[in-house]
Amino acid sequence: KVVNRMLELGMLIDVAHCTPKARSEIYEIVGSRKNCLLASHTGAFEINRDPYNLEDWELKWFADHDCVTGIIFMNYWLSPVDSPLGLKYIEQTISHIRDVAGANVLGIGTDFDGFTDPPDEITDMSEIPRITRYLYSLKRYSDEEIEGFLGKNSIQLLMNGWGK
């Protein structure tokens, strides 16, 4: 009932804190609608098998439904390896999601709320240029892909989802 009402009102539904079962139920309710879901801060299940990370089939579903997944800046969700450094884990997640679902589903989902433990290289929003420089230095991403990740994809979702 709640999900249907949210869809009627044109609200965006965030599945970041949903269990895999709840996410599946939401995808079923959403059906063929587009621009109505996001995962505001998560990782890729194939890289780190945390149940709150999205599985590859979900990433493809996001692409088919014009949704965005924000990459969380927290190693706990991005890698099964305990490390204080995380730029490479952020990029590894970006790369995996792009390869599975395309660059249009990518967004930033830092979760800089004070309760998480971000990588030492990026501890707050003032350090976002570090990930930007890192992505450009790899020469694996186009300007359009990096700009999409840094905000254009999320803005597009907001405009298409809320702008109705």
What label would you give each PLM region?
Residues K1-L12, C18-L38, P51-C67, K88-N104:
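Histidine/acidic residue-rich metal-binding segments in metalloenzymes
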Residues I13, T69, D111, I146:
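Conserved, mostly hydrophobic/aromatic
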Residues P20-K21, G43-E46, N75-L78:
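Short, catalytically relevant binding-site loops at active-site mouths
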Residues D66-L78, D82:
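A conserved active-site cap/scaffold subdomain adjacent to cofactor or substrate pockets
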Residues F73, A101-I122:
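Short acidic/histidine-rich active-site segments
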